[in-house]
Structures are given as C-alpha cells and as structure tokens.
Curated annotation (Swiss-Prot):
UniProt-annotated location(s): Mitochondrion
Transmembrane segments: none
Transit peptide, residues from-to: 1-20
Coiled-coil annotated spans: none
Name of protein: Small ribosomal subunit protein uS17m
Keywords tagged on the record: Mitochondrion, Ribonucleoprotein, Ribosomal protein, RNA-binding, rRNA-binding, Transit peptide
Family: Belongs to the universal ribosomal protein uS17 family.
A biological process term (GO) from this entry: mitochondrial translation
Source organism of this protein record: Homo sapiens (Human)
Description of how the protein assembles with itself and partners: Component of the mitochondrial small ribosomal subunit (mt-SSU). Mature mammalian 55S mitochondrial ribosomes consist of a small (28S) and a large (39S) subunit. The 28S small subunit contains a 12S ribosomal RNA (12S mt-rRNA) and 30 different proteins. The 39S large subunit contains a 16S rRNA (16S mt-rRNA), a copy of mitochondrial valine transfer RNA (mt-tRNA(Val)), which plays an integral structural role, and 52 different proteins.
GO cellular component: mitochondrial inner membrane; mitochondrial small ribosomal subunit; mitochondrion
Disulfide bonds: none
Length: 130
C-alpha cells in the first residue's frame, strides 16, 4: 500500500506576519494541519513565506491574505500581500461585527453614550405621546 502525498500549491494563503525588517517584504508564517498516516492524527506543520508588501503597511502580528505571483519577484519572494485580514490589536468578531478582546466585546465610550441618549429620547417620546 502506498501513501500518495500531494504538495499544496495554493494561490491564496492566510498567515501571520512574523517579521517586517526587510524593505517592502513581510515574513509570514502559515500553519497547516497534516495527517500522520500511522497515528491517524493531525499535527501542525509550519511554513514561512516571504511576501511583497509594496506600501509597507504590515506590522508584526497581523493576520494577512497572500496571493501567489505568476512570476517570482526574487529568489524567495513568490507571494504578494493581497489584504490585511486583521490588524494586530484590532480584532473584530465575524458574527456580530463588534470589536473584541479575547471573549469580551469592546465598546467605545461614544457608543455607550449614544445608546443612553437614544434610550432617553425614546422615553421622552413615549411620555409626550400620552
């Protein structure tokens, strides 16, 4: 019985920026789950890519989307930065769309003031109608 191993040539990759010291280049670490055929258990496999960041907008810790280039820009740079999915420290819950830190939602003081003002206005409208 032979095990067929396929290499992944992904055009789009999501990873975390681990370095930005090179000019217009971001060092991105991508983690994939790989099945061990003997143990039948998945293990993390990490790979590091270099991506062209023309505007130098990445910072260490950002979650980014990379696009494969048709022709490599350099010996190691074979991808370009397509989009910053999440900036470091500015995580937004995909279900509610609210900013969060860990398991708690962050509310700005302005949003809490506007909710209090809207409640006060609703009370005033109800009392004036009666």
């Amino acid at each position: 019985m032979s095990v067929v191993r396929s290499s992944v040539h992904a055009r789009w990759i999501v990873g975390k920026v681990i370095g930005t010291k090179m000019q217009k280049t971001a060092k991105v670490r991508v983690t994939r789950l790989v099945l061990d055929p003997y143990l039948l258990k998945y293990f993390n496999k990490r790979k590091t890519y270099f991506a062209h960041d023309a505007l130098q907008q990445c910072t260490v810790g950002d979650i980014v989307l990379l696009r494969a280039l048709p022709v490599p820009r350099a010996k190691h740079v074979k991808h370009e930065l397509a989009e910053i999915v999440f900036k470091v420290g500015k995580v937004i819950d995909p279900v509610t769309g609210k900013p969060c830190a860990g398991t708690t939602y962050l509310e700005s003081p302005l949003s809490s003031e506007t909710t209090q003002l809207s409640k006060n206005l609703e009370e005033l409208n109800i009392s004036s109608a009666q």
